[in-house]
Amino acid sequence: MVHRILAPRRTVHAHCDLPCGVYDPAQARIEAESVKACQEKFQGSDDAEFQARAVSIKEERANMVKEHLWVLWTDYFKPEHLEKHPSLHDLFWSATKEAGAA
């Protein structure tokens, strides 16, 4: 009787152990915009210390772009996404390579 009371009423399937369901490319976009802004500020300054700081922040943000994209790629996308969007693999591969080169 206890098993019947405590048994789940429906079965759900999740991509991870904790089905948070929060996947949004917005954070990757924000970090990419930060990379672009750091590059522009670097170009607009003659201050070596400021430039060094801009490079450090840019590299940190570029790594965050890659991290956010990798989470989407490894945790969110499933084979059916690739079937529906055949260019998805190349898009994510190119995006992470670009972030690494930034």
Which residue ranges define each predicted feature?
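OB-fold and OB-like single-stranded nucleic-acid-recognition modules
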Residues: 55, 74-77, 101
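Extended amphipathic alpha-helical scaffold segments
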Residues: 39, 66-73, 96
